[in-house]
Each structure stands twice: as structure tokens, then as C-alpha cells.
């Protein structure tokens, strides 16, 4: 795409985002009502679509993993990976889950077990068992399949095929170069930008709410909209500086530090918390997750509170992962250059998912233990304070809470930092080194988006906007998968003794041994 087209993508996206921010600032109640009505319509009519789409995406990832294409290098043949395995995993984890994991790791299991439950009566052992398996389900390989397939598409076309790092460029084999360089390609890139801004702004909104509640819980700092705006402004300055410093200096360093701090809290709570209960909960949850894998993947209640639960949780999560897919996908692709498709899928699909399971088992089980044994009423705590309310009842709770707060702050920066880089790429003809002023512009827009989300309804408004933004981009993801499979099917078999020859039927391509051809 030419520079002029890229500028148009940038300005069109910027105008759309600005209109949304202005509308939300002037008419917050109307925006809240509008997004709620649209969300209800989507949940009622498209829940089946979200569930089937994410499951099909997972099947596609598994198919490619065991196909003949698995040995293809995402880069030049023989190229070494840019980052070591530990650094790679740290960046996957920090950018891919970030604040959301810390935000929900305690609140979600407690909610499933003692509030709005998916199946069984609240507070029963069956509800507690459901809590962990559904938490694993929402944060497991389904989520990482969505990230992984989009990341694989970008990595394959950018590093193996040499295409620009744009969503539209990945559809060239499907729709043609001319179409992708025209208005259609520009519209697709605008959709990707809007989805990314929405997805990351939602994360910033969650982060601001939890940081504010954490400061209030620990230090009695006022918890209000003004303080949340101040936190977003401070964070914007920090992640803008990080984005300015470059991906290697900024994101890699912060990701490594945060992975270490997150595991300090994890191991600390595992030791001082109900260790045996945590181990039993993890094992039981994993078994239930595997045993009910497909029933959870395709489950749609007939109505009432159970359907409301589906909308509030599964549909919300699937939409969140789809909204985050262009951002996380491009970033994962960027840091995965030089790895084979097999190594890539195994790493992206399974390693972070297992880490998420462990986090949910430790934090979620620790909270459930307090609630189930009537030691503390964690279920009454606000979503944003559930983690801090849990930690305070265990030894070293204040210290662990402080570290947790720091982890959230760093996740805040790394998520937004990565997003400014990706948005800069999408606005700079796929340039892997976008100009700093472009990244700063997107940083400011994401901050304003997050502020408006909080202003118009807090957590619920964030969830509604995610579900809305994900629907149009999900169609683009389907096209990206189709384009990838089409291009892979045209790959020459990885056998140096075979060459492509012209078949008698001009529409048929045939590979034969070069030795056989020479002999004939």
C-alpha cells in the first residue's frame, strides 16, 4: 500500500476514534444505552457464531501443526530466532494476557462459584468445580488459538513471503494485489486499527480501575473517576516513553521484569496459601476442563440467567480475544521471526495457556478456600479488589499486594507499549519501525478511549464495546485464515529433489523427482 493510502488509513481511523470519544464525552448516557442495545442484539443472534468460529480456529491451528507445512520457517530458510525462548515466552505472556489475567484471576472463579453461576446452584461443590474449569476454558487454548492463527498469518506472509505487515496484505492471495492496494484494502486496515484500539483501550480501562482500587485498598487513596484519569495519564506518559525507546529496549526489558515479579507473587501465594487445596483444585479443574472441552465450546443455554452468564463471560471473552487479535497477532509475529510453524504453534498455543491455568488455580483456589470455609466473604468484594481482598488474609499479604500492584502497572505499560507499536505499523505501510509521532498519537487515542469507557459505565461499558468491535473484524479473520490455507496449499513440498513441472492439464501443478526428470 502506498504512503498516501497509509496516511488515509491513519486519518480515517483517527477521525472515527475522535468522533467516538467526542460522542461519549457529550452524550455518555446515550452511548451507554446504544452499546447495551447493540450488545444484547449480538449476544442473542450471534452467540452461536462466536462459539463456532473460535472452535474452528482452534481446529485450523491443530491441523496446521500436524500438516506438512509445520516445518516451514517463519523467515528465511535457516534463520535463527531473534529472541531466546525465555524472553519469547515472557513477551507472549505479558503482551497476550497482561492486565486482564491479574484482573480476573481471582474475581472470575469467585463469581462462577458464588455469584452468577454457569450451571449449578451458587456455593455448592458442583458450582466450585465449574468455576475452575470455565476459568481454564476462557483463558486456555481457545484464546491462544485466536491469537496464534492471526499471528501465524502475519508471520508467514511478512517473513516467509515478504509481504508488508498489514492486515490487507495478508489477503492478497485471496482477493488480489489490486484490490488490497485500493479502497477495500484500506477499509480492512481501518477495521484492524479500530479493533486494536478498542481491545487495548478496554485493557487500559480494566487496569486503571484495578490500580485505583488497589491503591484505595492498600493506602486509602480516593477511588473515583478523577483518580482513574490521573492514573491513565501517568501510564500514557510511561508507555509512550517505552514505545519511543524501541521494542528491544522497552518491551523486552519490561516483559522480563514483569514475568519475574508475577511469578514471585504466584510462588509466594502458593507457599503461604492453602497449598494442598490449590494442588487439588488445579488437578480437578484440569480434569474437568479436558472432560468437558467440547460441551463448553458449544454450550448455549436456552435463556434466563444462564444465557446472561454466557453473554457476560464466554461471548465477552471470545470478543475480547478477537478484538485483541490484530494487536497481539502482529506483535507475536514480530518477536517470532525465525521459528518454524510447528515451534510457533506449540509455543503460542500451549505454553501461555498452561501458565494461565496455574495462575487461576493459585489465585482462584486461594479465594474460593476463604469463601467456602467462611474465613472471608470475597464474593462481596468488587471485581477490581478481589485479588487484594484475598491476599490480605494470608501471611505476607501486604507485601504480595504491593508486588501485585506493581505487576498490574507494568502490564499496563507493556500492553499499551506493544499496541502503539502495532498501530504504528498499520499506519505506516507495514513498516516494522514506525515513526515515533505516529505511535505517540495512538497512545493518546487509546488513553482517551479508556477514559470514555470508564466514564460511560465502567466495566460493563468496556465489555459491551468489545463485543461490538469484534463482530466485523471476525469476518476479516475468517478471510485471513482462508488466505493462509490457500497460500500454504501452493507451497512446494520440502524436498530438494522435487521440482515443479508443467502438467498436461494447465490447471494442475505436479511435483516430480528431478532425478526422474533427468532420466527421461
PLM feature segments, named:
Residues 1-127, 267, 481-490, 514-519:
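N-terminal alpha-helical transmembrane segments of multi-pass membrane transport
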Residues 1-4, 28-42, 61-80, 132-137, ...:
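Membrane-water interface regions at transmembrane-helix termini and the short interhelical loops
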Residues 2-4, 8-11, 15-25, 58-63, ...:
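Helix-loop-helix module between adjacent transmembrane segments
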Residues 16, 49-66, 262-273, 355-365, ...:
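Hydrophobic alpha-helical segments of multi-pass membrane transport proteins
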Residues 34-39, 66-85, 110-134, 156-183, ...:
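Flexible loop linkers connecting adjacent transmembrane helices
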Residues 48, 85, 123-131, 179-190, ...:
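Membrane-interface alpha-helices at helix entry/exit sites of multi-pass transporters
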Residues 180-182, 192-339, 346, 351-402, ...:
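Membrane-embedded translocation segments of transport machinery
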Residues 498-520:
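Long, low-complexity, intrinsically disordered cytosolic termini of multi-pass membrane proteins
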Amino acid at each position: 500500500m502506498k504512503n498516501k493510502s497509509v496516511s488515509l488509513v491513519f486519518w480515517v481511523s483517527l477521525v472515527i476514534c475522535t468522533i467516538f470519544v467526542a460522542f461519549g464525552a457529550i452524550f455518555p448516557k446515550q452511548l451507554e444505552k446504544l452499546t447495551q442495545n447493540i450488545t444484547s442484539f449480538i449476544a442473542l443472534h450471534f452467540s452461536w457464531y462466536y462459539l463456532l468460529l473460535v472452535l474452528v480456529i482452534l481446529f485450523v491451528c491443530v491441523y496446521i501443526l500436524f500438516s506438512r507445512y509445520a516445518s516451514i520457517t517463519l523467515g528465511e530458510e535457516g534463520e535463527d530466532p531473534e529472541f531466546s525462548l525465555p524472553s519469547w515466552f515472557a513477551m507472549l505472556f505479558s503482551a497476550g494476557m497482561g492486565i486482564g489475567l491479574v484482573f480476573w484471576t481471582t474475581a472470575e472463579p469467585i463469581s462462577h462459584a458464588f455469584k452468577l453461576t454457569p450451571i449449578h446452584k451458587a456455593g455448592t461443590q458442583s458450582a466450585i468445580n465449574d468455576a475452575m474449569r470455565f476459568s481454564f476454558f476462557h483463558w486456555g487454548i481457545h484464546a491462544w488459538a485466536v491469537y496464534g492463527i492471526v499471528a501465524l498469518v502475519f508471520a508467514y506472509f511478512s517473513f516467509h513471503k515478504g509481504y508488508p505487515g498489514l492486515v490487507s496484505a495478508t489477503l492478497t492471495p485471496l482477493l488480489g494485489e489490486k484490490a488490497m492496494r485500493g479502497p477495500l484494502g484500506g477499509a480492512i486496515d481501518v477495521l484492524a486499527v479500530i479493533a486494536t484500539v478498542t481491545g487495548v483501550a478496554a485493557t487500559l480501562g480494566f487496569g486503571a480501575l484495578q490500580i485505583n482500587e488497589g491503591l484505595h485498598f492498600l493506602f486509602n487513596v480516593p477511588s473515583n473517576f478523577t483518580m482513574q484519569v490521573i492514573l491513565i495519564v501517568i501510564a500514557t506518559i510511561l508507555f509512550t516513553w517505552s514505545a519511543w525507546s524501541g521494542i528491544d529496549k522497552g518491551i523486552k526489558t519490561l516483559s522480563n521484569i514483569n514475568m519475574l515479579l508475577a511469578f514471585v507473587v504466584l510462588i509466594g501465594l502458593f507457599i503461604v496459601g492453602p497449598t494442598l487445596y490449590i494442588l487439588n483444585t488445579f488437578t480437578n479443574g484440569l480434569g474437568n476442563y479436558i472432560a468437558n472441552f467440547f460441551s463448553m465450546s458449544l454450550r448455549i443455554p436456552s435463556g434466563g440467567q444462564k444465557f446472561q452468564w454466557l453473554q457476560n463471560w464466554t461471548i465477552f471473552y471470545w470478543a475480547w480475544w478477537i478484538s485483541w487479535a490484530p494487536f497481539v497477532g502482529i506483535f507475536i509475529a514480530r518477536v517470532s521471526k525465525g521459528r518454524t510453524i510447528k515451534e510457533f504453534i506449540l509455543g503460542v498455543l500451549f505454553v501461555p495457556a498452561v501458565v494461565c491455568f496455574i495462575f487461576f488455580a493459585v489465585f482462584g483456589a486461594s479465594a474460593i478456600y476463604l469463601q467456602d470455609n467462611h474465613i472471608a466473604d470475597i464474593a462481596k468484594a468488587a471485581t477490581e479488589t478481589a485479588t487484594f481482598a484475598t491476599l490480605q488474609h494470608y501471611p505476607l499479604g501486604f507485601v504480595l499486594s504491593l508486588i501485585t500492584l506493581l505487576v498490574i502497572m507494568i502490564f499496563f505499560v507493556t500492553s499499551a507499549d506493544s499496541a502503539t507499536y502495532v498501530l504504528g505499523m498499520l499506519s505506516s505501510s507495514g513498516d516494522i519501525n514506525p515513526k515515533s509521532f505516529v505511535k505517540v498519537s495512538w497512545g493518546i487515542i487509546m488513553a482517551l478511549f479508556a477514559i470514555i469507557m470508564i466514564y460511560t459505565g465502567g466495566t460493563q461499558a468496556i465489555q459491551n464495546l468489545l463485543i461490538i468491535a469484534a463482530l466485523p473484524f471476525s469476518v476479516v479473520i475468517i478471510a485471513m485464515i482462508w488466505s493462509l490455507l490457500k497460500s500454504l496449499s501452493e507451497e512446494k513440498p520440502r524436498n530438494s529433489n522435487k521440482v515443479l513441472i508443467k502438467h498436461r492439464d494447465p490447471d494442475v501443478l505436479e511435483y516430480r523427482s528431478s532425478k526422474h526428470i533427468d532420466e527421461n
